[in-house]
Regions:
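Conserved catalytic or regulatory cores that recognize and/or transform ribose-phosphate-containing ligands
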Residues: 1-29, 34-42, 58-59, 89-92, ...
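Conserved NTP-binding/hydrolysis module of P-loop NTPases
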Residues: 44-54
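Residue-level signature of transmembrane alpha-helix interfaces in integral membrane proteins
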Residues: 53, 100, 236-238
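Glycine-rich phosphate-binding loop used to anchor ATP phosphates in small-molecule kinases
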Residues: 59-106, 293, 313-314
């Protein structure tokens, strides 16, 4: 498959794509990667690293067209390709596009993928690599623009949104296997894992159960995991600080198992007031993004754990996800762990209900849902 990968500045896409390429090589698959930004810098030897977006738009467009021309020529006979580029830029020139329709058509992409990550991480990377004054709000707006522009591009080039995907970069563990499978294993089933988040952050046993569920699904399917972007936890911490009257203080953002990278040596510092300024954006984009992740999946598999006191861990978010999947004709599978029986709103919309993750996996395997794998299990 031929894929175009987009994402705002600050996503650190190049090492991610190289990791996908290396992973493909380990599976015996040829996967070629093109980094449009690197090709542009190679052409513009007078431009210092990190400064290319400060060029006049006319020269920037000329450099980009020259770079894409090289990519089109170089990738013509290659089977599996990832082109690392952007759909939009929000820079000192304002908002502007980063592609030309004629060249995207000439690339003949099969899918367009927009890569996303937690906004405080994107903001941190952006300011580490570039001399620019961008707020968390700026980064939130840019991410939404990048997603929309990529989706519109897929509709224009592919004729529908069926080849458009939102993929999180992954912070606890990167999602190189997900992108590899999208490009090199396109026939694998695509799954949206659904589980409670906000209500269980202080329940380590339940978190471990959820992590096991997520890991098992990702072993056998292409998964689009909503827990890989966990900005709601950041907002909850900011709100708690604000209630203490500490809106001008800083938050040290530490990793969490839902999406935090345990490899970062120092926590990222963000101002409480700046997080509160994007409260509506965080909630709105979670709502939009999670539904899009369901739309791009073949089926939803939801884990309903039993919380202390025998209470079903069925959050309002999980209920809405199940209903959205049902109304959009997705296969709906529920792993129901509580002793209390599920309500008709679950039983009447679920394709099948299981009592354990192992039972669900056995059923999926018996139905031939597990994709074919190579000798390495991928």
């Amino acid at each position: 498959m031929r894929a175009i990968l987009t994402g705002q500045v600050g996503m650190d896409k190049k090492p991610y794509v190289e990791a996908v390429k290396d992973f493909a090589g380990q599976q015996g698959e040829a996967l070629d990667a093109y980094h449009v930004g690197d090709i542009m810098y190679a052409e513009a030897k007078d431009v210092r690293t990190g400064k290319i977006l400060d060029l006049p738009l006319s020269r920037l467009n000329s450099l980009r067209r020259a770079a894409f021309k090289d990519v089109i020529a170089g990738s013509r006979d290659q089977k599996n390709v990832i082109v690392n580029t952007h759909a939009t830029f929000r820079w000192r020139h304002g908002l502007f596009s980063a592609f030309d329709f004629d060249q995207i058509r000439a690339l003949r992409p099969d899918l367009l993928v927009c890569l996303v990550d937690n906004i405080e991480v994107v903001h941190h990377r952006l300011h580490e690599e570039h001399d620019i004054d961008a707020t968390l709000k700026d980064c939130m707006v840019w991410r939404e623009e990048e997603i929309l522009a990529t989706e519109l591009l897929s509709q224009a080039i592919l004729g529908s949104s069926n080849g458009f995907y939102i993929v999180s970069r992954g912070r606890h563990q990167d999602t190189r296997r997900t992108l590899f499978r999208l490009v090199c294993r396109p026939d694998m089933k695509k799954v949206y894992p659904s589980f409670p988040m906000s209500h269980v952050v202080d329940l380590p046993d339940t978190l471990a159960e959820i992590d096991h569920f997520r890991a098992q699904l990702s072993e056998h399917f292409i998964t689009f995991d909503p827990g890989d972007v966990d900005e709601k936890l950041l907002l909850d911490r900011a709100v708690a600080k604000a209630k203490e009257g500490k809106v001008d203080e800083w938050l040290d953002v530490t990793p969490h198992s839902f999406g935090g990278s345990k490899s970062r040596s120092k926590p990222i510092r963000v101002r409480v007031r700046e997080v509160l300024d994007i409260a509506g954006d965080i909630d709105g984009q979670i709502y939009m993004r999670d539904f899009k992740l369901i739309d791009q999946s073949d089926m939803i598999v939801s884990l309903i754990p039993e919380l202390p006191g025998g209470v079903p861990g069925l959050s309002s978010g999980v209920e809405r996800e199940l209903q959205h999947a049902f109304e959009h004709t997705k296969e709906v599978y529920v792993v129901w762990k509580p002793k209390k029986n599920p309500s008709p709103f679950i039983t009447e919309t679920a394709t099948r209900i299981f009592r354990s993750v192992d039972e669900a996996l056995s059923y999926f395997e018996s139905q031939g849902m597990f994709g074919e794998k190579n000798l390495f299990g991928h």
